[in-house]
C-alpha cells in the first residue's frame, strides 16, 4: 500500500502561479474611443477572466527548452485585460518571447529584454512568425533586446523585429 501512495506522490505537481498586478500611480489616462473599441472584451471573457482563480487553462509545454514555461493564453488574457490596442507591453524577462508574441497577436507593441542568447534567438523567431500571421490593428513593432546584464550594460543593442511586415 505505501508503494501506491509513493508512486502517486511522484506525479503530484503544483501548477499554481500567482499574478501581481501593479499600476503606476496618478491619474488614469484618457483613452481614445477607437482604441477602447478595438480593446473590448466579450461578456464571456469578462466573466471568466476576472475571477480570482483560472481553472480553464492547461499547462504549458516544456518543448521550447525554457525552465519556466507558461501557457500563451495567460499572457494574452493579461494583456487584453490590462492594456489597450496599440499600447506597449514591457517584458523585462522575455525568455522565449511568449509575452511579446501575445502582445503582437492582441494588437499591442512589445519591448522584450532577455539576457540568454539562446532564448533571444527563439524569441525573435516566435515574434517574427506572430507578426507575419497576425494583422491586428494597433501593433506597430516589437523589439527583442539582448543587452546582457542591464546592471553592467546600460545601453541596449538595437535588435528590432518589425511586427507589421
Regions found by a protein language model. Give the residues of each.
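Core catalytic lobe of class I
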Residues: 1-122, 165
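S-adenosyl-L-methionine
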Residues: 124-162
